[in-house]
Amino acid sequence: MCFTKTADNGKIKKIVCLTEKITAYKLAEFEITVEGAVGNAFDPDSLRLDFTYSSPDGKTHTHPCFIYRKVNIDENGVYTLDPAAEPVWRARITPTLHGKYSGEIALFENNAETGKISFDFAAAEAEDTRGFIGVEKSLHKAFQFENGEIFTPIGQNVCWGEKINWKERTSPETLDMHRRIFEKMHMFKANWSRIWLSAEWDLGFFGKNSRTDDFSSVLNRAARLDDLMKIMEENEIYSVMVFYYHGMFNDGGANTAWEYNAFNAKNPHGYLENPGDFFTNPRCIKEAKQYLRYITARYGYSRNIFTWELFNEVNFTDGDPDDIRAWHHEMTEFLRKTDAHPHMVTTSSSVNRYPLIFDDIFDYINMHRYGDPGNVKMIAHEAYLAFHDFDRPIMMEESGYDAYHPFTHYVARHCQLWAGLMANTPATAMEWFWEEWDLYTNGTDDIYYSYRDFAPAADFAELIPRADPHQRFVSRERLALNHPRADVLGYNGADYAYLWIYDSCYTVKNPEPVKITDVTMELFLENGEYLIRWFDTYTGTFFKTERTEIKGRFIRITPPEFTKDIALAIEKIK
């Protein structure tokens, strides 16, 4: 620990820095001893600790503290609350500058201050200066770290971990699946995932018998999420954190889970007669803010949180659309005020023309796209229209051949990865059935089979200058591609082009590859000498390289014979 400070008066008695050495852009954690305070520590109007600190640039930040309780982890990796451990207060922040900080933690009971402790600390210079992820600031069609480095999401959903007992809506309280999948993803350069915090099982805070205003009974799950954050950091995975999902608040609709919902009046601590009332009931609105406050207090420090997602497929809930929109506005404003760290905010819908997902309160547009044939074309079409209409990044955060049944087919996965990457979206389209894909080997004994496709996509993505103001999205019409089966998606700058050329008839329903020959397409580039490299999207290697000189700002390209798909990088060398 780096310091301990005691107080002589008030109910805050001591603060201990738990971080050995505080460093910019790394977690700084503190434990606060409070005596004699009374109230519900999950309701800030009843009892709260606020951490206010001034950074070296003179700016002041306020971040909530949270209740923590020690857990035991058995030989099977199951997390349970330690019955001998008392709850304690903790604070977590990520300093973004090196230098001296002044901090103050204040205790409030029934919104009246009843204790305070002041202290100073210093943050050493950062080893990793990339910072948090946000929207690229000039063109608004990609993502970047605070230092300007582009971040291209490559990955899949891993919304929960262990095998679920769907009848009971329970699952083992372990991290085995997340750890295994994230380690495999990291091996093959995948860097993005998505996690649900709201389901009745796994990491969810709202089980059938849970209280809606007090998370004491699920602090073992909160501790498991602490360790999942560490696993994400170790494997360089940046995850979307989803607060609620659609099934919680529909009665008989898609994936309904209303009977298991803690808010349901038929359950021990519930009080809602109708699930749609969640969006307007004053108590629900207050408790939603308590929940968001706790999550941001405990995990908001993490640079590995890609974004906060308020709802998964909120269109499937029983709420009125106007009420849903008003709720999202209120919660987004609350999140931005409460989270002292610059995380993005979004929401999602199963319908890609649902008006809410385009609302300008969100940092990017979050789409879901399932189905084949035509999935590649629809990903490209919807992304193109959305970007030109709304001038924000678009992500396909769920994709798959079939939305309702676990179905693994390598054609669908490969094409969705590349379509997302090359169709005017700054990320791969993200597959849904992660558990089935983890086990998929295509008849081989290769346990990494389904993960190998990530690395070539990641390598090719590194070449694309996402922040180039002269870059434009191109498809077959603009490139005058001449072949009836071949199609193309990609990016054309003044002196480069990065293209994905694919057999549009090679789909799940037509999985036999056909040799594609005699393709031509036209590019307009600055005059000069260029390097043309052809890329194997399955092995991740450039298999053919040639030089050419462009005169008259025009070149006709003839791809080599291929099956399935290939990619092209053409770059000016002088």
Predicted regions and their residues:
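Short, hydrophobic beta-strand segments
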Residues: 32-34, 89-96, 559-560
